[in-house]
């Protein structure tokens, strides 16, 4: 009886472990349709646009930063987005994904110049 009770509790409270599914294409110029199961250490999906191509792959969420992604992909200009749902790295609205550090730096520089121009020393 105790064994049966333990088995029932195990099935009720333990969820099966499924690996994350992500699209997986390198420097694609078209919509990616190939998917893959991510390994346990890659817990998010990445979509990164660089130049005329788009990268789709499994990615470690803690490494979802401009520096890590640009180093790994050997790209100096890119926009990227990491997500944690199955097949979430689709090429919809890629123009709205995170801006790169260089875009933010240009905006900050422009703001500084406007402020300096309006408030002379």
UniProtKB/Swiss-Prot annotation:
An individual GO BP term: negative regulation of activation of membrane attack complex
Location in the cell: Host cell membrane
Xref: SUPFAM superfamilies: Snake toxin-like (SSF57302)
Pfam families assigned: CD59
InterPro entries (UniProt xref): CD59, CD59_antigen_CS, LY6_UPA_recep-like, Snake_toxin-like_sf
Domain UPAR/Ly6: 20-104
Protein name: Surface glycoprotein CD59 homolog
Species of the source: Saimiriine herpesvirus 2 (strain 11) (SaHV-2)
Phylogenetic placement of the source organism: Viruses, Duplodnaviria, Heunggongvirae, Peploviricota, Herviviricetes
């Amino acid at each position: 009886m105790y064994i049966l009770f333990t088995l029932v509790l195990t099935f009720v409270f333990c969820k099966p472990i499924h690996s994350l599914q992500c699209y997986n294409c390198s420097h694609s110029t078209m919509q990616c349709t190939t998917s893959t199961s991510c390994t346990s250490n890659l817990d998010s999906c990445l979509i990164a646009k660089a130049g005329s191509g788009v990268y789709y792959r499994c990615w470690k969420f803690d490494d979802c930063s401009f520096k890590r992604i640009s180093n790994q992909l050997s790209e100096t200009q890119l926009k990227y987005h990491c997500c944690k749902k199955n097949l979430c790295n689709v090429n919809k609205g890629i123009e709205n994904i995170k801006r790169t550090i260089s875009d933010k730096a240009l905006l900050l520089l422009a703001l500084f110049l406007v402020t300096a121009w309006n408030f002379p020393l």
